[in-house]
Amino acid sequence: MVGSRSASHQKTVKIVPMTNRADKLPKSWDPQAVEKDLYEGWVEKGYFTADPSSSKPAFSIVLPPPNVTGQLHMGHALDHTLMDGIARRKRMQGYEVLWLPGMDHAGIATQTKVEAMLKETEGKSRWDYSREEFIEHVWEWKRKFGGTIGTQMRAIGDSVDWSRERFTLDEGLSRAVQTIFKQMYDRGMIYQANRLVNWSPILETAVSDIEVVYKDVEGELVSIRYGSLNDDEPHVIVATTRVETMLGDVAVAVHPDDERYADLVGTTLPHPFLPDRQMIVVADDYVDPEFGTGAVKITPAHDPNDYALGLRHNLDMPNIMDATGHIAGTGTQFDGMDRFEARVKIREALAEQGRIVKEVRPYVHSVGHSERSGEPIEPRLSLQWWVKVEKLATMAGDAIREGDTVIHPKSSEPRYFDWVDDMHDWCISRQLWWGHRIPIWYGPEDAEGNRDIVCVGPDEQPPAGYEQDPDVLDTWFSSALWPFSTMGWPDKTPELDKFYPTSVLVTAYDILFFWVARMMMFGTLAGETTPEILGQGTDGRPQIPFNDLFLHGLVRDEQGRKMSKSLGNGIDPMDWVERFGADALRFTLARGANPGVDLPVGEDSAQSSRNFATKLFNATKFALMNGAEVGTLPERSELTDADRWILDRLEEVRVSVDDYFDRYQFAKGNEALYQFAWGEFCDWYLEIAKVQIPRDMEAASAQEQARGRNTQIVLGQVLDALLRMLHPAMPFVTEVLWKALTDGESLNVAEWPTAAMTNGGVATDEVAARRMADVEKLVTEIRRFRSDQGVKPSQKVPGAVDFAAADLAAQEDLVRSLARLDQPAEDFAASASIEVRLSQATIEISVDTSGTVDKEAERKRLDKDLAAATKELETTAKKLGNESFLAKAPEAVVAKIRERQQIAQEEVARISARLEELK
């Protein structure tokens, strides 16, 4: 018998009639039937509400604010799953957790959406309204439609503190924006200047780099001859994809070492359409002499590289377009034309002059487009407000270099330093109406046309008669204040005292520069200017906004491609919630989330996670039906090898999971839980429990009763700890199962597992571990052997095994039960045998299958299996032979296909051998 003890040590177990805890569970797991009510109950009980007066250690996260216009996409779902997992675990570990939610006003995105709505419903543009009227329309839209993301966050189980939800245009956050703007303006860190920006002619505003999407387009490459049309006289040939910009050309650049143009450097060439403009030939290392003709036209007001060269050579920078992308102010016949119409007309006019040397069509090249309005972006010289970033970037870089904030994974540090160490001044003004209006006021013009400029703080009033700057701030300006403005800065608040700096920021690596670096810049600045509010940093350095920075990868499709509308491969996370449940969505993402590594997902992944939730449900229900409960563990000496093994494995998993989660290795931690839950607890220990728990406790012997009762306690112990550890990733199914198992209040207020909750903190029983590893191998090999012999899984056959030789005498009944082997009779005659190498010996297993196998039926079955295995082998070989696929597919996908190929090869060999035996 398993774990048998001598009669002198047997105890009488009192059998107490128990209510069946499994009755507390529904018939089957249906996420849709329970998730919404569970979540609302958690919120009502205040489980997620943070208490700044608590004596518990603090842990805080701010939610990267999604756009008020948006809906949750897979990237959001990954973000939220990881943050929620962190927050839930920290609560269980005894921390006072603040997970602070909120939304971004999303200046351009929201304004364009409302403009489109007004155009459709009222046939009007924003210019048909006063600024105040239009803004009121936006607020009305926000009140009607801005709650979508909040509803979706509830659906996936976000344990945020809804009582502290913030919006970037809230009064308190607006006060923070004005405060830091004035601090920076007064320090000379904000200034106004004419510089090159990304300009959207449709939106009529500057846009940030992140709002520019690059697409390959079929255009034209036109070569233009500047200078004399006589080959014997000075001339150069330049090529451009934007012929219209030649109206802004002020120079031609060549490389200093290019002897072809050495005599031309410093001379001028007449502009074809502007007789008063002479274009100087300049020498600059920017030019590649090997590319094209080695000469480049220079349009400083409409190209970033030309702008930089223009600054170096002190060139004029004439702006040839107005805010709508029409040619303006050139004094030519092209004024008033749209830029694309002008492109054609100017090319035709140049051709008439004989200046078109060559035209290439189509010419495919990458062009930046406005993410919001879709048209090609126009680089344009524009008067804007700018942040002088030099000092801010230095502080943001030093915070990482000094270890005040730690980036996970460390491999992302070089990208961060590349950005902050080579950062250009930041354009913060936008020509919009929706957003934080720039707190700059202009006085009346004096006799010389000059105006007094005043920066007004949140508690100040502008002088009478002054007019406010019409522009608003870049959305990233206010979101850069998010970690501390949401807690009340610039006022001193209990929230800042308790929860700042925040513990960790969780976000995707693709906004490391656009958002994260700017939060570091503004966070360290606020730490430097208001240490009495935000606290002192380390070693005299400014306080930082977060201690850890966890950068996860991007969610991609199963082939590793970016999800996009054009590819039609996008996945709506809410569709998965409806079809598979929130836990399945969350576990799919959590199980694949490695720091800094992209995550390929597909429907198969979600179905697998849904199956896992069902497996947990069925396993718990089975355990409860068999009397599993949480209680005091018996003495180790009273447990079977299987009991000790599963408890020790539980402790090993707990230790590794804690280590993984502490290092933000969520994929490894959740994979460890999955493999333990399914591969060890469900597949093995539950099957063992069926053997160890008597079918009829009252009729069983005292020894069998004791063993069965111990098994019930071990079942409860393992399930209790396992459900607790899975709760951060799968909060709904674990809550239902844990409450049925323990009668506890909620996992939201339960303790995170410790060694005392697993194996009692004792050393691992290596002998029990060895024996159970041998049991698993032996049972697996016998099952495979039976299958190869054509024996049905449910059919018992007599078998002879030398258990004692393998030190498995105490496990004989267990192995025979799991492997469906009867004791051999006296007249036993083996029809087949195999050898299995175990840790202590190589033993022979002999079975008698005579009369149990229909050879003809077995041949047909094997032929069918062989055909399937051969097809799988051909399919995988074809994929692995496709060089294009191998170059594009993620390593994990290729590795999975190689594994499938290996399994198929083994199956073909095994089945072929068995067919040969049946001949």
Swiss-Prot record:
Extent of motif 'KMSKS' region? 562-566
The UniProt function text for this chain reads: Catalyzes the attachment of valine to tRNA(Val). As ValRS can inadvertently accommodate and process structurally similar amino acids such as threonine, to avoid such errors, it has a 'posttransfer' editing activity that hydrolyzes mischarged Thr-tRNA(Val) in a tRNA-dependent manner.
Keyword tags: Aminoacyl-tRNA synthetase, ATP-binding, Coiled coil, Cytoplasm, Ligase, Nucleotide-binding, Protein biosynthesis
Q: Supply the name of the protein.
A: Valine--tRNA ligase
Q: Which Pfam families match?
A: Anticodon_1, tRNA-synt_1, Val_tRNA-synt_C
Annotated PROSITE patterns: AA_TRNA_LIGASE_I
Could you tell me the Gene Ontology terms of the biological process aspect for this record? Answer: valyl-tRNA aminoacylation
Where is it mainly found? cytoplasm
Gene source species? Corynebacterium diphtheriae (strain ATCC 700971 / NCTC 13129 / Biotype gravis)
Q: What interactions and quaternary structure are annotated?
A: Monomer.
Q: State the NCBIfam families in the record.
A: PRK05729.1 (NF004349), valS (TIGR00422)
Q: What is its EC number?
A: 6.1.1.9
Q: What is the lineage of its organism?
A: Bacteria, Bacillati, Actinomycetota, Actinomycetes, Mycobacteriales
Residue span of motif 'HIGH' region: 66-76
In the UniProt record, the gene name given for this protein reads valS
